[in-house]
Amino acid sequence: MINSSDFSRSSAQIIKYPIITDKATRLLENNQYSFVVDRYSNKITIKSAIEYLFNVKVIKINTCRLPRKQKRVGKYVGWKPQYKKAIVTLSEGDIINLFTDS
């Protein structure tokens, strides 16, 4: 069941930014894209946001919540925030242009 608060959030607030790492670029060959998403969003809202923003068909979504990490600056100890990552598999023929063509 989808909460009514999920409908009120815009798609741009759910999808924060794409992940560009070595592993993420290898996954592009399999038509899989990685995004950092809102911690409290679920797979249904992520799917609808991706389909709305990029006009593509989503087949599968894998999500994981990564733990917060300790960060140290001198004698002071702080924490990097916890975040959620989504790996989105698109249907055959659909692409998301992450790199601009110049």
UniProtKB/Swiss-Prot annotation:
Subunit-level organization: Part of the 50S ribosomal subunit.
UniProt record, GO biological process: translation
NCBIfam families: PRK05738.2-4, PRK05738.3-4
Function (record text): Binds to 23S rRNA.
GO CC terms, sorted: chloroplast; ribonucleoprotein complex; ribosome
Transmembrane segments: none
Family as reported in the entry's similarity comment: Belongs to the universal ribosomal protein uL23 family.
GO molecular function: rRNA binding; structural constituent of ribosome
Matching SUPFAM superfamilies: Ribosomal proteins S24e, L23 and L15e
The name this protein goes by in its record: Large ribosomal subunit protein uL23c
Location(s), subcellular: Plastid, Chloroplast
Protein's gene: rpl23
Keywords: Chloroplast, Plastid, Ribonucleoprotein, Ribosomal protein, RNA-binding, rRNA-binding
PANTHER family, sorted: 60S RIBOSOMAL PROTEIN L23A
Pfam family, one: Ribosomal_L23
